């Protein structure tokens, strides 16, 4: 049984946002589920040094946000967004929300670069925003000029990677930095949108069935070259 926080006043409204800010030179390694006791709340893990998710997920959290950005606040103390300058989020091994216990509607992955080598699940929407950005709480990104070395790919999904949700939205904002899918499985019950401010390389596995599927529209946009190999299946018009 998960005990509630005894420092919170039970006569006041429950927490809506739970921020776990990590100050470390090492990436956070999350190998289990984070459970919210009481009313549903957004769970945020922020570590500029990076985050490794291997069997991570949330229970009783409407929204799960993993970010390498530094949280920014409004004058009233509410969360304004994140300043992302560095750090990689890696999803591997046991994946994210792979356990049937999860009831997470929204998953946000906000980092300089994101690597997907296992499955990611959310009931309503998966949003990935990669690049050096200021990102608000609605995942709207404003790019920050960068003078340091850039990653080769802002978002890189391997053949063992996958995403399963209603809406799937992936955007790489950094100029000249690409987005790549190396045969990972995509299943969007509604729409799939992928945008790259560099090249976009989208490879589907060599099977009879399309491994990129959406019941609605599929949108692939690239500032530079767009290379697609394999099958796409869209139920949109």
Which role fits each region the language model picked out?
Residues 87, 151, 191, 196-237:
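Binding/recognition "hotspot" determinant
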């Amino acid at each position: 049984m998960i005990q509630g926080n005894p420092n919170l006043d039970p006569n006041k409204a429950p927490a809506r946002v739970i921020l776990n800010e990590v100050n470390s030179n090492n990436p956070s390694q999350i190998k289990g589920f984070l459970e919210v006791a009481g009313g549903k709340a957004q769970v945020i893990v922020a570590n500029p040094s990076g985050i490794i998710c291997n069997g991570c997920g949330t229970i009783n959290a409407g929204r799960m946000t993993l970010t390498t950005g530094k949280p920014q606040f409004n004058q009233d103390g509410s969360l304004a967004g994140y300043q992302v300058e560095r750090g990689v989020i890696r999803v591997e091994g046991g994946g994210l929300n792979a356990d049937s216990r999860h009831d997470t509607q929204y998953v946000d992955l906000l980092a300089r670069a994101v690597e997907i080598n296992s499955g990611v699940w959310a009931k309503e929407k998966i949003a990935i925003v990669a690049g050096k950005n200021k990102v608000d709480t609605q995942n709207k990104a404003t790019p920050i000029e960068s003078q340091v070395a850039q990653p080769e790919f802002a978002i890189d999904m391997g053949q063992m990677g996958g995403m399963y949700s209603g809406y799937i939205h992936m955007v790489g904002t950094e100029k000249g930095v690409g987005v790549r899918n190396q045969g990972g499985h995509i299943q969007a019950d509604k729409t799939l949108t992928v945008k790259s401010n560099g090249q976009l390389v989208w490879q589907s596995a060599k099977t009879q069935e399309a491994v990129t599927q959406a019941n609605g529209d599929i949108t692939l946009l690239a500032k530079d070259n767009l290379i697609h190999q394999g099958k796409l299946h869209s139920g949109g018009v």
